[in-house]
């Protein structure tokens, strides 16, 4: 069915006021969008940042009167409205549209990430079937791609691999399909642990092959291979801990790092690892090396 969409151009300071007011006058959803292609990376802890110029989009039932909505907003906020407009939009099958756009992707020589509803393009390749969970890795982001390609290029047979910040489990599962003996995944998000477990089962990974932990429950260990696709800040602050999780002679790959942050992150690991040249893609980098 169609919907009435109301759009307001607001500042971050106005966001909460107008969100509350729109919900009070009957909006069924309220969404904030960047108005000027302004990226936000690594926000401070316990903050929900907005762009300096933000579009607020609210959906109403199609029979809602936009002039009445605007009149109620003026009444509730006690102020003239910022730049605003209303239009009727047709409903779409958003899930189907998204599924159609998520296609199989190849990483390196052997590895494919294949949506579970899609046929594998190469039956004899290493095919990882994925139903991505909310906000977790699918391989479409450059940092995930950098890590997957790195894993594809390693000799993983017989190794133990640690996926630190496992998200969907895509890196741990890829390592197992590429020959790792066992993998360990850890994440601070319980939903990530569940998504990883579901994706492992979808790929026929036995429970004893993949151990999943919240950080506080992870046992002491030194892995043969550690991959961490998180953020530069945690990678720097956790450098002593992550370095200690890799055995002497073991391998490390880090991503989730902006290009301008690469040297700082590399410096945090240089004492403990013989580092490879930094690999850059689309403004993101991968740092890898071997434990001294």
From Swiss-Prot:
Keyword Coiled coil in record: no
Source species, domain of life: Bacteria
Cell compartments where the protein resides: Cytoplasm
Residues the record lists as binding S-adenosyl-L-methionine: 144, 165, 187, 229
Keyword vocabulary terms for this entry: Cytoplasm, Methyltransferase, S-adenosyl-L-methionine, Transferase
InterPro entries recorded: Ribosomal_L11_MeTrfase_PrmA, Ribosomal_PrmA_MeTrfase, SAM-dependent_MTases_sf
Predominant location category: cytoplasm
Any one of the GO CC terms: cytosol
Enzyme Commission no: 2.1.1.-
Example GO biological process: methylation
Coiled coil regions in record: none
MF-aspect GO terms: protein-lysine N-methyltransferase activity
Catalyzed reactions per annotation: L-lysyl-[protein] + 3 S-adenosyl-L-methionine = N(6),N(6),N(6)-trimethyl-L-lysyl-[protein] + 3 S-adenosyl-L-homocysteine + 3 H(+)
Alphabetical list of Pfam families matching this protein: PrmA
Family statement drawn from the similarity comment of this UniProt entry: Belongs to the methyltransferase superfamily. PrmA family.
Purpose: Methylates ribosomal protein L11.
Protein name: Ribosomal protein L11 methyltransferase
Organism encoding this protein: Pseudomonas putida (strain ATCC 47054 / DSM 6125 / CFBP 8728 / NCIMB 11950 / KT2440)
Protein's gene: prmA
């Amino acid at each position: 069915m169609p919907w009435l969409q109301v759009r307001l151009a607001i500042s971050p300071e106005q966001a909460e006021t107008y969100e509350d007011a729109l919900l009070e006058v009957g909006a069924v959803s309220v969404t904030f969008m960047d108005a000027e292609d302004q990226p936000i990376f690594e926000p401070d802890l316990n903050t929900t940042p907005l762009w300096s110029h933000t579009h607020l989009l609210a959906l109403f039932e199609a029979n809602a009167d936009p002039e009445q909505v605007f009149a109620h907003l003026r009444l509730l906020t006690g102020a003239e409205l910022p730049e605003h407009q209303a239009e009727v939009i047709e409903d779409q099958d958003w899930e189907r549209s998204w599924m159609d756009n998520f296609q199989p992707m190849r990483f390196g020589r052997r590895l494919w990430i294949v949506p579970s509803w899609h046929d594998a393009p190469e039956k004899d390749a290493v095919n990882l079937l994925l139903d991505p969970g909310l906000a977790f890795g699918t391989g479409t982001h450059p940092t995930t791609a950098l890590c997957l390609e790195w894993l594809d290029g390693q000799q993983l047979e017989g190794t133990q691999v640690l996926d630190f910040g496992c998200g969907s489990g895509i890196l741990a599962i890829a390592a197992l399909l590429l020959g790792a003996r066992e993998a360990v995944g850890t994440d601070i998000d319980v939903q990530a642990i569940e998504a990883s477990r579901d994706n492992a089962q979808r790929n026929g990974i036995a429970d004893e092959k993949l151990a999943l932990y919240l950080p506080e429950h992870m046992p002491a260990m030194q892995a043969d291979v550690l991959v961490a696709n998180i953020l530069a800040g945690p990678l720097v602050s956790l450098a002593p801990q992550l370095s200690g999780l890799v055995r002497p002679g073991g391998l490390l790959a880090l991503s989730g790092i902006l290009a301008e942050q690469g040297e700082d992150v590399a410096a945090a690991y240089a004492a403990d690892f013989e580092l490879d040249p930094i690999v850059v893609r689309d403004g993101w980098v991968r740092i890898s090396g071997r434990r001294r």
